[in-house]
Amino acid sequence: MEGNRDEAEKCVEIAREALNAGNREKAQRFLQKAEKLYPLPSARALLEIIMKNGSTAGNSPHCRKPSGSGDQSKPNCTKDSTSGSGEGGKGYTKDQVDGVLSINKCKNYYEVLGVTKDAGDEDLKKAYRKLALKFHPDKNHAPGATDAFKKIGNAYAVLSNPEKRKQYDLTGNEEQACNHQNNGRFNFHRGCEADITPEDLFNIFFGGGFPSGSVHSFSNGRAGYSQQHQHRHSGHEREEERGDGGFSVFIQLMPIIVLILVSLLSQLMVSNPPYSLYPRSGTGQTIKMQTENLGVVYYVNKDFKNEYKGMLLQKVEKSVEEDYVTNIRNNCWKERQQKTDMQYAAKVYRDDRLRRKADALSMDNCKELERLTSLYKGG
């Protein structure tokens, strides 16, 4: 069972990397796999948030600047650290400072998000999107911005979960929830924390935005989680991708393979007609013949007379005449269209030369069509 837990944790890590890269489908696939291996709370929490809010991922790409935050945080709260200077080392405005202080002074999660206690899912999503972008430590360098960002993430993660929201409402405020964490009813807070990290939640909403090489560590009560915005490919992931990649390539090539097979089969099944309206040395159809009814000329090979006699010959000659009439009719239509176009152009541009040229068109195919029509009527 412990072996399954290790594999499940690997799947969760791969899912988090996928979220950082904005690949929600891959993250969801690995989280579902982790759930089958071992029931990790973090996997369940991530999966629930993705299923509820994943459709928004990837719609709001953002560019992250390398963060140098290293603010000293409160016990059991967010710690955002890199090898650079602290949050105060970068520029920030008075409005950002006031906003951070306002968030950190809030006593309950409803105040944090600025919503009422009867707020629905859409209200929570709207409030979270607005605040998460405003207080993300890579955009807001005011002291305490990391704590505020974490608090906003925890607020949404708890209030968007019906069960956790119901139990949270029993405590009245955040501090009471923290004080009651040893009580079995409130152990879902894990020391005032949700089962999903603030950065994971942000990546689900914004499709792995703010890509960079910076590292953010968020403490979730009993254990910390470090995210590196770089591609870390494990052997487990590569093996999974190879399997999926091979199958997906096969699926993509399937229509082409089917098309080739159908083309080959049709060539094998459909034989060349025993005649041609024009001499074709490649097929040996060079012997000239003429239909008995309309006198249409066609060409056959040397074995034709031995193979086609009587009724068979009549069927062939009927097909010859039908093909010939169809060709003549099409060519006549083209001739008429050409003549009409030339006459119209001559009228528009008042060009007598073009008008005379249009009148001089021979219309050979139309004359032949008239001859064939008279033969049909006469027959």
Swiss-Prot record:
Residues 108-172 form the J domain. Residues 1-244 are cytoplasmic. GO terms for biological process: cellular response to misfolded protein; chaperone cofactor-dependent protein refolding; protein-containing complex assembly. Residues 55-94, 219-241 are annotated as: Disordered. The lineage of its organism: Eukaryota, Metazoa, Chordata, Craniata, Vertebrata. It is a single-pass membrane protein. The keyword Endoplasmic reticulum applies. Interacts (via J domain) with HSPA8/Hsc70. Forms a multiprotein complex, at least composed of DNAJB12, DNAJB14, HSPA8/Hsc70 and SGTA; interaction with DNAJB14 and HSPA8/Hsc70 is direct. Changing H136Q: Abolishes interaction with HSPA8/Hsc70. It holds the Pfam family DUF1977. Belongs to the DnaJ family. DNAJB12/DNAJB14 subfamily. One of its GO terms (molecular function) is Hsp70 protein binding. The chain crosses the membrane at residues 245-265. Keywords: Chaperone, Endoplasmic reticulum, Host-virus interaction, Membrane, Nucleus, Transmembrane, Transmembrane helix. SUPFAM superfamilies: Chaperone J-domain. It comes from Homo sapiens (Human). Its main location: endoplasmic reticulum. It is found in: Endoplasmic reticulum membrane; Nucleus membrane. GO terms for cellular component: endoplasmic reticulum; endoplasmic reticulum membrane; membrane; nuclear membrane. Acts as a co-chaperone with HSPA8/Hsc70; required to promote protein folding and trafficking, prevent aggregation of client proteins, and promote unfolded proteins to endoplasmic reticulum-associated degradation (ERAD) pathway. Acts by determining HSPA8/Hsc70's ATPase and polypeptide-binding activities. Can also act independently of HSPA8/Hsc70: together with DNAJB12, acts as a chaperone that promotes maturation of potassium channels KCND2 and KCNH2 by stabilizing nascent channel subunits and assembling them into tetramers. (Microbial infection) In case of infection by polyomavirus, involved in the virus endoplasmic reticulum membrane penetration and infection. This is DnaJ homolog subfamily B member 14. Residues 266-379 are lumenal.
